Amino acid sequence: MKTLSYLLLVFAILPCIALAQLLNQSEPLPGVTSSGQPDAAELAGLAEKGFVAVIDLRGESEDRGFNESSVVEELGMQYVSIPMSGSEAVNYDNAATLDSILKTAGGPVLVHCASGNRAGALLSLRQMLIGEDADSALATGIAGGLTSPALREVVESKLSER
């Protein structure tokens, strides 16, 4: 009986542990978690928590260590790739794509890159696109993982264009 109780406890907390271990994890918006690269176990934890989609901002040439799209789809979540390599990819077209996905997802979504910086950057532009002022949009991006001074400059420049 003791062993059964222990196993039940372990399986009950595994999804929570997986979610808590995401690299640079934050929840900058309700229903939107941003982070660095998750592994397969962390993705399984997200599926257990009811996440419906994973938005991968990493470029095609970036090594993930596993076939992320296959794992996400096998777990019953939608996989979306918005490849963002280089500062020119921090743009309002990609922000509009992100906005469309977030509006139609129907549940919690993970937005990730390698470290969380691109996730925060794109979330900033998305917030500006939907009508937030530049300061609020930037604050959302910072809350979403935007920590790189160089990328922040790019975001601030893009925000000032609107």
Name each region found by the language model.
Residues 16-109, 124-162:
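Cys-dependent protein tyrosine phosphatase-like superfamily
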